[in-house]
Amino acid sequence: MDALDDRVDRFLLGGAQEQLAAGHPVGHDLEGMDLFDEQWERNRELIESVLDERGDAIRLASDLAYEGEDGGRAEVAVEDIDEKREAYLDVGAATVDGYEPPIRESDAVFVKGALGVFEDERFADGTVGVLDAIAETDCFSGVGGGDTSRAIGMYGLSEDDFSHVSIAGGAYIRALTGEPLPAVEALEAAANR
């Protein structure tokens, strides 16, 4: 997000790291989760800095979904979470409803990653709801990442409803942020021989 500076008007986020940086006790249990712990510590300062500097352009999920006692989907407002009790597996319906208007008003929308554990139908609502909203617009839409493109196929959406779909999420982000792409550089060098 930091590399995109003023080129982006609005960020609609569903990730646990951003919620943690904003002071909400969500995310994975960090005990025994070395990979998540390392990722969080590596990104913490950057995320907190971006939230501080661009907070007016960033919207975080307002509610989250988890597995209720009956095994079904349950939702809770983020503001009502005072301690980590559940594994939050998707954004909630209010978040999707809140994200739809800015998506529909945009000239361009870029998506990287799913908003929930979409492989489990109970927790696909966030991912599918946002992808549906994007698919219904006339704006330029870029979708990046293997999971996101897989969700398109799993839930009956058509890649034709999006301007660009990439299964290479990392390369997609590097291209958006202007970082060099080694494969493209190699092709350019070969073409100039």
Which residues make up each language-model segment?
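Active-site loop-to-helix "anion-binding N-cap" substructures in soluble metabolic enzymes
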Residues: 1-193
